[in-house]
Amino acid sequence: MREGDSGYFSCYDGNRFRLVILASQRAHELSSGACTAVARKGDKNTVVALREIVGEQLDLAAVFKLAVNRCRKYLEEFTNAREVAAARSSQAAPKSAPGQEIGKSFREKDPSAAAFLDQEQFFSGGGE
């Protein structure tokens, strides 16, 4: 974002991550056929979503809740798929090779790198 653009998004107090999550969720809704709250003017869904957010045309708490629910669903599917893959690999392959890092979580590999996103805070709806 350019220096002069900060006034447009003043309601986010510098939390660009939350803005991206909201715009992404709203663009996803628009792609799924939701009606726009502003004139489209030939803009793409991402631009329309940002214009709706800037124009305060949406219930942002509801949009954020939908984004959190969508993320939870994705994580559940990902976790289930990972468990199935782990079960299959444990049946077909030897237990583990020396130095193998497959199966280690992101936090186990580098705990400091994962500190930028507190998962519990995100899922509780607390963006700040």
Curated annotation (Swiss-Prot):
Entry-linked HAMAP family: RNApol_bact_RpoZ
Superkingdom of this protein's organism: Bacteria
Positions of region (Disordered): 87-106
Catalysed reactions listed for this entry: RNA(n) + a ribonucleoside 5'-triphosphate = RNA(n+1) + diphosphate
Family: Belongs to the RNA polymerase subunit omega family.
Complexes and interactors: The RNAP catalytic core consists of 2 alpha, 1 beta, 1 beta' and 1 omega subunit. When a sigma factor is associated with the core the holoenzyme is formed, which can initiate transcription.
One GO process term, biological-process aspect: DNA-templated transcription
Keywords, ordered alphabetically: DNA-directed RNA polymerase, Nucleotidyltransferase, Transcription, Transferase
Gene Ontology terms for molecular function: DNA binding; DNA-directed RNA polymerase activity
Protein name per the record: DNA-directed RNA polymerase subunit omega
Enzyme superclass (EC): transferase
Entry EC number(s): 2.7.7.6
Function per UniProt: Promotes RNA polymerase assembly. Latches the N- and C-terminal regions of the beta' subunit thereby facilitating its interaction with the beta and alpha subunits.
Cysteines joined through disulfide linkages: none
